[in-house]
Amino acid sequence: MSSEKNYLNENYKSFFDDSLSVTDPELHKAISDELKRQQQHIELIASENIVSQAVLEAQGSVLTNKYAEGYPGKRYYNGCEHVDVAENLAIERLKKIFDCKFANAQPHSGAQANGAVFLALLNPGDTFMGMSLNSGGHITHGLKISMSGKWFNPIGYDVDKESELIDYDNVEKLALEHKPKLIICGGSAYSRVIDFKRFREIADKVGAYLMVDMAHFSGLVAGKGYPNPCEHAHVVTSTTHKVFRSARGGIILTNHEDLAKKFNTAVFPGYQGGPLMHVIAGKAAGFLEALRPDFKDYIKSVLANAKILSETLKNNGFKIYSGGTDTHLMLVDLRPFNVKGNAAAESLSNANITCNKNGIPFDSEKPMITSGIRLGTQAATTRGFGLKEFEKVGELITKVVKGLSENPEDNGKIEEEVRNEVIDLTSNFPIYKNLK
């Protein structure tokens, strides 16, 4: 007798056999439309990337069915022997990539990784220091409306107004004055190499923990294009999907066994419940890619492409904050063109170039308006763009912003011209040809 005869009704069979296009055409169309957008747009958002087919497969696997509270070998549920393999692969690959002794791959996001560190090391009301959002920090580094700003006492440090770089002497002065329990370095819109050794010296002077949030540059570290903060920090957190180019999520790294135990407990059961095992599998797949020699080549290209894009824009009259970039990202000040960040980002999006509005340090504009845009080269580098293409991208951005400056009420003609050029350019660097 066929096993299919045992279904109580045909709906059970279709539940396991029918594709999304059959069961939910509306959702399938939204996903298909997003695929087309990614294929035909130049992605310059500094926090996004394009993952491999392998990462997509791992994250879309049957591991989504498995609950696995706890850690490998110490689960609260049975049947975890195979997901244990996936998580152990993620952990061991992280340790190898970043040359660290302990790793936690369970945080659902970078924000939750940061929250778990706060839970492990701080008590409500404790003082900590982080780069202010206005200078390129992150909302989890002390923004008043965030958990870190509500539960703790954040002290923000800013970049120097003249050099537009971190003022380490001022950081030390603030640390000596406020005696923080934790000092955070790293941010979401700071494009220069950070002196981790100096930060550790400052932390040691006041008896503080040093935490590095390397969400934006962990991929650069993995590809040997940026100093490794694990050599100096008590704890390092990161996302896994930006330049790192793995499945979307967070990680926590440390070289201290006593702290590792605290972080594990803070993640589970302190801050999260069951880990997302399909996501951890996707992370593991991406981590293996980061261990391969061609990942270093990718990082070299990301950095070289950022330099050429930055220089092209500077030569065309834009101001690049801090004068350039040491990373994948750059903060572009639009005030020389009398254009606001929100208007530029919208017009560029209409032209199939995707970026985000971003405040510049000490910006007088509101957060939803801004005086700048933030650009990153990692996603377009992943699809194969090189120096020639990024020089072209710089010219296309210039064309759109200049058009907007000259005709702020209607930049449609320029947007259409650039959009056609972008579609032609991206067609030479196809992605996900077998997806529908």
UniProtKB/Swiss-Prot annotation:
Its cofactor is pyridoxal 5'-phosphate. The record marks 241 as: Plays an important role in substrate specificity. Its EC number is 2.1.2.1. The modification N6-(pyridoxal phosphate)lysine is found at residue 242. It is found in: Cytoplasm. Gene3D superfamilies: Aspartate Aminotransferase, domain 1, Type I PLP-dependent aspartate aminotransferase-like (Major domain). GO terms for cellular component: cytosol. GO terms for biological process: glycine biosynthetic process from serine; tetrahydrofolate interconversion. Disulfide bonds: none annotated. The keyword Iron does not apply. It catalyses: (6R)-5,10-methylene-5,6,7,8-tetrahydrofolate + glycine + H2O = (6S)-5,6,7,8-tetrahydrofolate + L-serine. SUPFAM superfamilies: PLP-dependent transferases (SSF53383). Pathway: One-carbon metabolism; tetrahydrofolate interconversion; Amino-acid biosynthesis; glycine biosynthesis; glycine from L-serine: step 1/1. Homodimer. This is Serine hydroxymethyltransferase. It comes from Pelagibacter ubique (strain HTCC1062). The lineage of its organism: Bacteria, Pseudomonadati, Pseudomonadota, Alphaproteobacteria, Candidatus Pelagibacterales. The gene is glyA.
